[in-house]
Amino acid sequence: MDNIDNKYNPQLCKIFLAISDLIFFNLALWFSLGCVYFIFDQVQRFIPQDQLDTRVITHFILSVVCVGWFWIRLRHYTYRKPFWYELKEIFRTIVIFAIFDLALIAFTKWQFSRYVWVFCWTFALILVPFFRALTKHLLNKLGIWKKKTIILGSGQNARGAYSALQSEEMMGFDVIAFFDTDASDAEINMLPVIKDTEIIWDLNRTGDVHYILAYEYTELEKTHFWLRELSKHHCRSVTVVPSFRGLPLYNTDMSFIFSHEVMLLRIQNNLAKRSSRFLKRTFDIVCSIMILIIASPLMIYLWYKVTRDGGPAIYGHQRVGRHGKLFPCYKFRSMVMNSQEVLKELLANDPIARAEWEKDFKLKNDPRITAVGRFIRKTSLDELPQLFNVLKGDMSLVGPRPIVSDELERYCDDVDYYLMAKPGMTGLWQVSGRNDVDYDTRVYFDSWYVKNWTLWNDIAILFKTAKVVLRRDGAY
């Protein structure tokens, strides 16, 4: 393998990312003052002239401390974290600084303006993460943030690690090859599989290469061997991907027993906590009411369009809810009135359609769907009436995919996880390919969601849903 051209420069990355955060943290205050001036045509009424310089200097000091916290404590400029995980840490930090700013104003008896304070910290919550991501994107384009990476392993764990890294561009891991002396494939995902150990050491000498150990759980000795060898060759950058597929990860605390090679994983089931369920329910009610208010004109229009063929606008099909309780899952009708007869006739006469139905319980070219129905399905507008299911408590905004009773047997050992949560209007499978993923993958997504539930995950999935719906990914 030829020498690699590595433009990665960690010092420049730290400087650019820190400067970006510093600039836009401070611009948030000036933008807030601009908004106040634009709305009220004056600023002195909210911040007296003799306090303005002090407030600007204080905000600058807060920005320096915040950037220092990002740099030293959270390691945002050196340690590569997934986008949504890093965004959560940014939001949490800025909210803490906003509260500290409020306390500072109270103790110093400065004139307090709720408009300036709300505008300032709202802008900070938007500008800092947005331009952090933009800066990383530009650094990626220049190759400065990209880190040449080799994955050691060629099994399912290694392939899964590669797919995960490809989905997180902002992490900047540029995988150039796999390595496994026992691999049978010459290529994986169009990347070469290195089988000669000397090539690894040659690459290590010629560039700053990151190594990811992603062997299977049956290959633990290989992981130990390569950790030792990479350490002997002074490799500073090594990541281990344990084969923990199926275990809850988001709600897991890790600790060690001193002087023993024992790692303790404390696994929590958040959805089993009454406080978590109350928080999720409150979030569902508030958000669904807001969406209903905004979407009500559109829903009235769709009701009119759907009923033009003489049938009802909304129908409720029985779906499996929490603890196995059946409920009518509301949707705008997207099929002809005699849909069951059409389906029976199709499955009786078309073996290809029958095989597709038995595999996924869906048809890509479904003759039962009306012209209006095809549009509302493609845009997911047919699911808007499920907001009433959310208000009733049958469903959640985010959760596992609503299924019929016959599908429960397809969940096998994961059926207990499915029955622990309310079905959702959207979920992991909707933002991860929707109808383009196979049924086993849908089951995996549903069980993963339940095992790893956090409110932040729900928020992230809702934002991803908006993107998927606008792009119409995997919808039919």
Swiss-Prot record:
Transmembrane ranges, per UniProt, are 15-35, 52-72, 93-113, 115-135, 283-303
- Which pathway does it operate in? Bacterial outer membrane biogenesis; LPS O-antigen biosynthesis
Enzyme class, broadest EC rank: transferase
**One GO CC term, this protein:** plasma membrane
Enzyme Commission code(s) on record? 2.7.8.6
Topological domains (Cytoplasmic): residue ranges? 304-476
Q: List the catalytic activities from the record.
A: di-trans,octa-cis-undecaprenyl phosphate + UDP-alpha-D-galactose = alpha-D-galactosyl-di-trans,octa-cis-undecaprenyl diphosphate + UMP
Q: Which domain of life is it from?
A: Bacteria
Which GO-annotated molecular functions does the record name?
phosphotransferase activity, for other substituted phosphate groups; undecaprenyl-phosphate galactose phosphotransferase activity
The membrane topology noted for this protein in its Swiss-Prot or TrEMBL record is: Multi-pass membrane protein
One GO process term, biological-process aspect = O antigen biosynthetic process
Q: Which family does it belong to?
A: Belongs to the bacterial sugar transferase family.
* Protein name, per record: Undecaprenyl-phosphate galactose phosphotransferase
Lineage, opening ranks: Bacteria, Pseudomonadati, Pseudomonadota, Gammaproteobacteria, Enterobacterales
